[in-house]
C-alpha cells in the first residue's frame, strides 16, 4: 500500500504533507439501526418478531440518494463520517449466514463517500444489545442462543420495547436506556464478556456462550473487513479504520449486591428493578418495584408499582424446538429455567436469593471485581481479539478503542496494548439536557466530576448560570482528554458521539420556529469540544428521514441535525456570483491564488433573499400548525481548522459575536499549496463582503474549492513558523434569527473603513 491518507502521529492525525488534520464529523445515519425490508422503525409492530427475514440493503440511504446526503454534509463542513452499521445487518438470518448483498451495497455507498473526500471509520453499533431487547445491534438469534424468548419481554419487563408498547406514541422519553439495567441486557452483556466465568453451564456447539457470541461477532466484522479489502479501492482511500463495539456495558459483572440498586447506577426511570427482582419477574413472579422520574437534578423516586407477569416468563419454554438455528445446546443447560437460577444465584422453588454477591467476584478464582476490573480484563480481552482480527485483514487500520461510557478508561499506558495506531473514542452527552429535553440556562451539574469523586457532596457539583454551565461542559471534556493521556497513553481522542435533543420543551420549536434553546445547547457543546483540545468529533446524528412526529424514528430520540420538516441554511448555490473583474488586484486581500479560483460574493440583501427561499427536502411531513425553522444550524454550521501547518494550540468560535480565533505553532514549509493552514469558513456566518480577517503574520486568501460539484468556503493561511494567531469577524445575528440588522452591518462597515483586510 502507498502513502497513508491519514496517519496517527502520537496524539495527532497527519496527512501525507505532515500537517495536522482535525476530524470534523457526523454519524451517518440513524436509519442504520433498523431494517429497510421490511421497514421497521421502533414504533412499528408488524413483522417485528420475524427478525431473521429482513434486509438492511438500502440503509442508511439508497445509492441514488447518497450523492444528495454526502454533498449536503460536505457543504456543511464535515470531513469525517462515523459510518453506523449493525451486526444484525451482516448476520441476521442465522449464525454464520452473511448478507453479501448488504455488504456489496455498503461498499458502493463507501465508494460514493470517497468521491466527496470523506474520512470514514466504521462503527459496529449497538444499543441495549438488540432491536428485540429495545435497541439495536445484535441479531435476534443471539437472544435465542442465550435461552431468551423475546415475546416474553413485554409482560415481564425484561426489556422495554417501543415496538411492543401498547401505544408507541406514548413510549416514555429516554426510557429505552434503562434496559441496560434490566434482565435481558444485563444477561447478554454478562454472557458476551464473562460467560466462561459466570455461566460455565452455558455451553452451545461445544463452547461457552461467551466464545460463541464473541466468536460470531468478530467473525462477522472480519468477513465484512475482508470484503472491503477485496474491493481494492476502499481501504485508506476512504475507510481509515474501525471502532470497537459501540457503548460496551458490563452487564452484571462487578455488581456487589444484586438485591439493591448499585450506588453507581446513575439512571433510574420508570420501574427500577434490582437485578434480583429482574430475575424474578423474568421468571413470571410478581414484584413490587420502585418507580422513578428524572428531574433537573437527576432521578428521584416517585413511588412503587407491582410488576406482575402473571406466570409468563422471558425464557424459552422447556419444549422449545432448539434445532431452528442448527446449534446443539449442552444437556446441562436447561431451557425453561432462569440461567442464573441454574448457576445457584437464586432458588426458584422458594424464590430466595442465595448468592447476592455472585457477580462481585470471579466465581472461579474469588478475585474481587468492580467496573475498573471489568474494563481492564473482560473488556480488554474482547477488544484485543477484535483488533487483531481486523488487523489480520488490514495491518494499517486505525482502531478506535471505545471503552465503557463515562467510566475510567483502561490502564494501557506503557503496556503492550499502548498501540501507536489506536485512537481513544469517547462518548459524552449533557445528561440533564438529554433526559429532560430542555436547555436549562440556570444550572447544570458536573457529572464527570461527581463520577470521579471530585466533590465531597454532589451539591458542590452544581454550576449556576449559563457561562458557568458552558465552562463546566468544556472542563468535563478537557478532563476526559487529560484522563485519556494518563491512562491510555499518547493517542488522539475523538468524541465519536455528542449531541442534543431537538424536540425540547414539548416540541416548542416545531410549533413556533424558535430554536433559540437548541442553538444555545448546541453552541455550548461545540464550545466544549473546541476547548477540550480533542482531535475532533463526530456529532450524533444525521437521520435522512427525521420528522417532527417521530424524530429519528427510533425510541423517541430526536437528535438529528437534519429533518425533512425543517429548513436548511442556504448553500453557496443560492448566493449570487460576482464578476471576478470587480476585485481590486492591489487589495491586500487579493492574491494570485484567487485569480485561479472561482469566487463569489453575497450582500446583505442577497443573503436575506436566499434565507427566505431555502433549499429543503422535497418530502414534507409536518402538520400544518408547524412553523419551519433552521434547526439550530447556526450553532453547528461553524468555522473550524481542517488542516494545520504545525500544531493547534487553541481555537474556538464565539457564536454571539461571530468571531473565530485560532492560535497555532507554525512549521516552516514555504509558500506552496501544501504549506497552507486551511479553515472551513461557512458563508452563512462569513459572507465574503462582510468578513474581517486579522493575522499576526503571513498571507491569507478566501477561496471556494470544489469537491465533486460541492463548493464550500475556505480560508487558507500561509504563516511563518512559530507562535501565530488569526481572528476572523463575521456577521452577528440573534440566535434563531438568520437576518442581518442594520446595526450589525454598520459595525462591519466601520471595520471595513478601519484599514482591515476585508473579503
From Swiss-Prot:
It comes from the Eukaryota. Disulfide bonds: none annotated. Residues 584-599 have a biased composition (Polar residues). Gene3D superfamilies: Glycosidases, Golgi alpha-mannosidase II. It is an enzyme of class 3 (hydrolase). Residues 576-600 are annotated as: Disordered. GO terms for cellular component: cytosol; membrane. Keywords: Glycosidase, Hydrolase, Membrane. The active site is at 247 (proton donor), 497 (nucleophile). It is a peripheral membrane protein. One of its GO terms (molecular function) is glucosylceramidase activity. The keyword Magnesium does not apply. This is Glucosylceramidase. It comes from Aspergillus fumigatus (Neosartorya fumigata). The gene is egc1.
Amino acid at each position: 500500500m502507498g502513502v497513508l491518507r491519514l496517519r496517527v502521529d502520537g496524539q495527532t492525525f497527519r496527512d501525507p504533507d505532515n500537517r495536522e488534520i482535525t476530524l470534523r464529523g457526523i454519524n451517518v445515519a440513524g436509519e442504520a439501526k433498523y431494517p429497510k425490508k421490511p421497514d421497521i422503525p421502533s414504533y412499528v409492530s408488524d413483522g417485528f418478531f420475524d427478525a431473521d427475514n429482513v434486509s438492511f440493503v438500502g440503509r442508511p440511504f439508497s445509492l441514488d440518494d447518497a450523492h444528495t446526503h454526502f454533498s449536503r454534509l460536505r457543504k456543511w463542513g464535515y470531513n469525517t463520517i462515523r459510518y453506523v452499521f449493525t451486526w444484525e445487518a451482516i448476520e441476521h438470518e442465522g449464525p454464520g449466514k452473511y448478507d453479501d448483498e448488504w455488504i456489496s451495497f455498503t461498499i458502493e455507498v463507501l465508494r460514493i463517500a470517497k468521491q466527496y473526500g470523506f474520512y470514514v471509520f466504521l462503527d459496529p453499533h449497538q444499543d441495549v444489545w438488540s432491536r428485540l431487547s429495545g435497541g439495536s445491534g445484535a441479531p435476534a438469534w443471539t437472544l435465542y442462543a442465550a435461552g431468551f424468548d423475546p415475546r416474553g419481554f413485554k409482560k415481564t419487563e425484561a426489556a422495554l420495547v417501543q415496538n411492543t408498547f401498547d401505544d408507541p406514541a406514548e413510549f416514555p422519553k429516554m426510557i429505552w436506556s434503562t434496559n441496560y439495567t434490566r434482565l435481558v441486557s444485563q444477561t447478554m452483556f454478562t454472557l458476551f464478556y464473562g460467560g466462561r466465568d459466570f455461566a460455565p453451564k452455558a455451553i452451545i456447539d461445544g463452547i461457552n456462550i461467551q466464545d460463541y457470541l464473541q466468536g460470531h461477532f468478530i467473525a462477522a466484522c472480519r468477513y465484512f473487513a475482508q470484503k472491503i479489502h477485496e474491493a481494492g479501492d476502499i481501504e485508506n482511500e476512504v475507510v481509515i479504520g474501525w471502532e470497537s463495539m459501540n457503548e460496551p456495558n458490563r452487564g452484571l459483572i462487578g455488581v456487589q449486591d444484586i438485591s439493591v440498586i448499585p450506588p453507581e447506577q446513575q439512571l433510574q426511570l420508570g420501574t427500577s428493578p434490582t437485578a434480583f427482582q429482574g430475575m424474578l419477574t423474568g421468571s413470571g413472579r410478581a414484584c413490587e418495584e420502585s418507580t422513578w422520574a428524572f428531574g433537573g437534578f437527576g432521578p428521584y423516586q416517585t413511588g412503587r408499582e407491582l410488576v406482575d407477569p402473571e406466570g409468563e416468563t422471558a425464557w424459552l419454554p422447556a419444549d422449545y424446538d432448539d434445532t431452528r438455528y442448527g446449534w446443539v445446546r449442552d444437556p446441562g443447560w436447561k431451557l425453561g429455567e432462569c440461567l442464573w437460577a441454574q448457576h445457584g444465584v437464586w432458588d426458584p422453588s422458594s424464590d430466595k436469593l442465595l448468592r447476592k454477591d455472585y457477580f462481585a467476584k470471579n466465581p472461579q478464582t474469588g478475585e474481587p471485581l468492580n467496573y475498573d476490573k471489568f474494563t481492564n480484563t473482560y473488556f480488554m480481552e474482547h477488544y484485543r481479539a477484535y483488533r487483531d482480527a481486523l488487523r489480520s485483514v488490514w495491518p494499517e487500520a486505525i482502531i478506535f478503542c471505545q471503552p465503557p461510557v463515562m467510566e475510567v478508561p483502561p490502564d494501557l499506558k506503557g503496556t503492550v496494548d499502548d498501540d501507536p495506531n489506536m485512537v481513544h473514542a469517547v462518548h459524552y452527552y449533557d445528561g440533564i439536557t438529554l433526559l429532560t429535553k430542555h436547555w436549562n440556562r440556570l444550572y447544570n451539574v458536573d457529572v464527570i466530576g461527581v463520577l470521579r469523586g471530585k466533590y465531597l457532596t454532589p451539591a458542590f457539583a452544581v454550576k449556576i448560570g449559563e457561562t458557568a454551565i458552558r465552562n463546566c461542559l468544556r472542563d468535563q471534556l478537557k478532563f476526559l482528554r487529560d484522563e485519556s493521556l494518563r491512562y491510555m497513553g499518547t493517542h488522539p481522542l475523538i468524541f465519536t458521539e455528542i449531541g442534543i435533543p431537538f424536540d425540547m420543551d414539548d416540541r416548542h420549536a416545531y410549533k413556533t420556529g424558535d430554536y433559540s434553546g437548541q442553538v444555545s445547547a448546541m453552541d455550548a457543546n461545540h464550545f466544549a469540544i473546541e476547548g477540550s483540545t480533542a482531535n475532533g468529533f463526530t456529532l450524533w446524528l444525521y437521520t435522512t428521514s427525521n420528522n417532527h412526529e417521530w424524530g429519528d424514528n427510533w425510541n423517541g430520540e430526536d437528535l438529528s441535525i437534519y429533518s425533512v420538516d425543517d429548513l436548511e441554511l442556504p448553500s453557496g448555490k443560492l448566493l449570487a456570483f460576482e464578476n471576478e473583474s470587480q476585485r481590486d488586484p492591489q487589495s491586500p486581500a487579493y492574491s494570485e491564488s484567487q485569480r485561479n479560483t472561482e469566487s463569489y460574493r453575497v450582500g446583505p440583501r442577497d443573503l436575506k433573499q436566499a434565507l427566505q427561499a431555502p433549499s429543503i427536502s422535497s418530502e414534507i411531513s409536518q402538520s400544518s400548525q408547524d412553523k419551519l425553522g433552521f434547526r439550530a444550524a447556526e450553532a453547528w454550521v461553524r468555522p473550524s481548522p481542517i488542516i494545520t501547518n504545525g500544531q493547534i494550540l487553541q481555537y474556538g468560535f464565539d457564536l454571539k459575536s461571530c468571531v473565530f480565533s485560532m492560535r497555532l505553532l507554525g512549521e516552516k514549509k514555504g509558500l506552496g499549496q501544501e504549506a497552507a493552514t486551511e479553515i472551513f469558513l461557512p458563508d452563512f456566518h462569513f459572507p465574503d463582503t462582510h468578513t474581517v480577517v486579522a493575522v499576526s503574520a503571513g498571507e491569507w486568501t478566501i477561496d471556494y474549492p470544489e469537491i465533486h460539484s460541492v463548493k464550500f468556503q475556505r480560508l487558507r493561511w500561509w504563516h511563518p513558523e512559530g507562535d501565530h494567531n488569526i481572528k476572523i469577524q463575521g456577521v452577528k445575528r440573534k440566535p434563531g434569527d438568520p437576518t442581518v440588522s442594520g446595526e450589525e452591518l454598520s459595525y462591519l462597515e466601520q471595520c471595513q473603513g478601519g484599514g482591515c483586510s476585508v473579503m
